[in-house]
């Protein structure tokens, strides 16, 4: 069986290795000049052996596939396990950096209101009997019409709780609250609830040396020449002999095609015959988050430990170099949703300047930065966004259709996984498609 895999990110590499090891004839077409896709560690911009993730960053203790890959390639997780309640620790507002005690003084109800916000989604999640099939929720049609913003309004959250709820949506889903389906949030909560049962408290960690160590390991397991770089697919024709995948002047024949890339570049691909209407609607319509990650390295660390939420342009500021022995450190500005889009419209140097100003407002003692980068995923045509976000109405319309085979066309990538939006989901989707193809050959 000859298979063309489009995309050399985690999903494509996972599928390619499994299919190759099972004896299939596999070619991987990658439009860029590197593997990994949105799993991308950048270190060339920094000194002292430090680096930061331009894309996906966290591997939770419940992400068993990713943990297995980390072990397989001789990597390790860092020692700084983080719980997601840490994002409430600091708030920069009106020129002041406020800690937990300050926040409690400003609004004694803040913690309770945020608990009510999360509690709503937990109650909906209780009706998600299988996180892989959220549309089977008894009230799926109702909850999928609601957005996270609708829930904020229904609960009448106060000013500070609204800010934290907004930043949570911008951070977790890379979108504004009105762009996130309440059913999608509930699906994610149900997934974590089920996964956490055998693992206890869910904590997140980074991979020492970066996630690119995993993608490099997977790529090295494939035969030389299997991955064809600089091959941008522009047409897929299906006839009685199979699929013909065109990338510029080159054409590749396949029995099966695995589309393991973001849906956004597929919107420019000519399919002959055209995709079925419901599938075409999903390919062209599914929402994508907009994250701009701006990492700046400073010669010394003059900031407190922990996440900081800000009303400024950086949205969330944290240190990805916690635990690194060097005196220097990196501050990350994580900007999602409309803020991420606004930054993406600027040149990289302008983005870095904007985030430096925002960080300096928070920490006036910051010395001049040594270097850095700003990665705006929504501004890159090969990706068109950071990761999928199912907007109101899209779970019931798009979830199932993207996870089914369509003749010889199969979709993989985090947008087709139960672990949507995560490195774990990319690996999961590659395994799922490979298993399906091998079961039916």
Q: Where does each model-flagged region fall?
A:
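FAD-dinucleotide binding site
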Residues: 1-441
């Amino acid at each position: 069986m000859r298979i063309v895999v489009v995309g050399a990110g985690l999903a494509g590499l996972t599928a390619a290795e499994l299919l190759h090891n099972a004896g299939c004839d596999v070619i991987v077409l990658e439009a860029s000049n590197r593997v990994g896709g949105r799993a991308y560690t950048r270190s060339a911009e920094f000194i002292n052996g430090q680096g930061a993730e331009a894309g996906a960053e966290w591997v939770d203790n419940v992400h068993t596939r990713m943990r297995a890959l980390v072990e397989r390639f001789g990597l390790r997780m860092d020692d700084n396990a983080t719980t997601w309640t840490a994002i409430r620790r600091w708030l920069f507002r009106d020129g002041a950096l406020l800690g937990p005690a300050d926040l409690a003084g400003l609004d004694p109800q803040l913690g309770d209101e945020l608990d009510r916000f999360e509690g709503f989604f937990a109650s909906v999640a209780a009706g998600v009997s299988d996180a892989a099939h959220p549309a089977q929720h008894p009230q799926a049609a109702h909850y999928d019409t609601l957005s996270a913003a609708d829930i904020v309004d229904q609960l009448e959250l106060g000013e500070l709780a609204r800010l934290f709820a907004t930043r949570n949506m911008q951070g977790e889903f890379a979108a504004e609250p009105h762009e996130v389906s309440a059913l999608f949030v509930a699906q994610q909560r149900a997934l974590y609830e089920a996964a956490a049962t055998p693992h206890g408290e869910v904590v997140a960690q980074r991979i020492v040396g970066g996630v690119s160590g995993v993608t490099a390991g997977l790529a090295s397991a494939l035969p030389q020449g299997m991955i064809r770089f600089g091959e941008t697919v522009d047409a897929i024709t299906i006839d009685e002999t199979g699929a013909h995948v065109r990338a510029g002047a080159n054409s590749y024949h396949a029995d099966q095609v695995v589309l393991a890339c973001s849906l956004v570049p597929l919107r420019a691909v000519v399919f002959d015959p055209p995709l079925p209407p419901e599938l075409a609607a999903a390919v062209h319509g599914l929402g994508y988050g907009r994250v701009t990650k701006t990492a700046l390295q400073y010669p010394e660390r003059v900031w407190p430990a922990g996440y900081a939420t800000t009303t400024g342009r950086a949205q969330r500021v944290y240190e990805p170099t916690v635990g690194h022995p060097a005196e220097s450190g990196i501050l990350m500005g994580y900007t999602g949703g409309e803020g991420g889009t606004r930054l993406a419209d600027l040149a990289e140097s302008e983005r870095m300047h904007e985030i430096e100003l925002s960080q300096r407002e928070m920490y006036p003692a910051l010395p001049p930065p040594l270097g850095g980068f700003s990665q705006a995923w929504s501004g890159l045509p090969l990706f068109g966004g950071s990761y999928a976000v199912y907007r109101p109405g899209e779970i019931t319309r798009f979830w199932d259709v993207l996870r089914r085979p369509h003749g010889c066309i199969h979709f993989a990538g985090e947008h087709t996984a139960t672990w949507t939006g995560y490195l774990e989901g990319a690996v999961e989707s590659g395994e799922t498609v490979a298993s399906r193809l091998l079961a039916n050959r």
